[in-house]
Structure formats: C-alpha cells, structure tokens
C-alpha cells in the first residue's frame, strides 16, 4: 500500500478559499493554515504567560495545522452555506469526518494514532 498522506497535504496549496468578504488577494488553504497556526500558537502563549492559565501552545498550533485537511478531498465551502441550516451543518460535518478518516487511512498503521487527535 502506498502511503500518500503527505502528498495529499501538499495539495492544500491548490485549494482556493472562499473569502467572506471581497479579497484583493486570493488565499489558498496552505496560506490560511499557516496563518491560523501562528495565531493559535500566539494566543496560547498569551493565555499561558500573561493570564497564567495552562495552555499547550504546540498542541494548539498542531490543531490549527490540521483543522482543514479534509478539504484536500472536499474543497472549501463558504461558511454561510456550511451553516445555513442545522441539518446542512450536521451533514457537512459528516462529510468532513469521512474525509479526515479517508486521509488517515493513507498513513501507516503505526502513525494513525499520532495523527488522529488532529
């Protein structure tokens, strides 16, 4: 079996995001993911070091890195559409869950447990 996990992740740079507002510069999933991870990490560090509340910055950053990986199979859907009705939101969540599981199946068994939390 070929392990194509990282090849699929490399596709994120080809997935165009749906901006909620008119954007002067289009954004792809890879760019969005990097920005999200940096912000998540920074906010976690602020929580831990300024507000003195426990928060694992590295874990937050990794959650952000993998938060849109299902889109390598589904593409991006505009947020207003995704949440238009409760039923549509639930159905789309099922699709995203199946896409994430499909992606996990491209990993060797020894690595699946390490990636599953994300």
Predicted features along the sequence, with ranges:
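Short alpha-helical hairpin
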Residues: 2-20
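Short linear capping/connector segments at secondary-structure termini
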Residues: 23, 81-84, 115-118
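Alpha-helical phosphate/pyrophosphate-handling elements in metalloenzyme active cores
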Residues: 24-58
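An active-site-proximal "capping" alpha-helix that borders the catalytic cofactor pocket
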Residues: 36-43, 96-105
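Active-site alpha-helical segments that house and flank conserved acidic catalytic motifs
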Residues: 38-44, 58-77
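Aspartate-rich (DDxxD/NDxxD/DxxxD) Mg2+/diphosphate-binding motifs
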Residues: 53, 74-86
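Histidine/acidic-rich helix-loop-helix segments that form or flank divalent-metal centers
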Residues: 58-62, 105-118
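Divalent-cation-assisted or electrostatically stabilized phosphate/pyrophosphate-binding catalytic cores
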Residues: 81-99
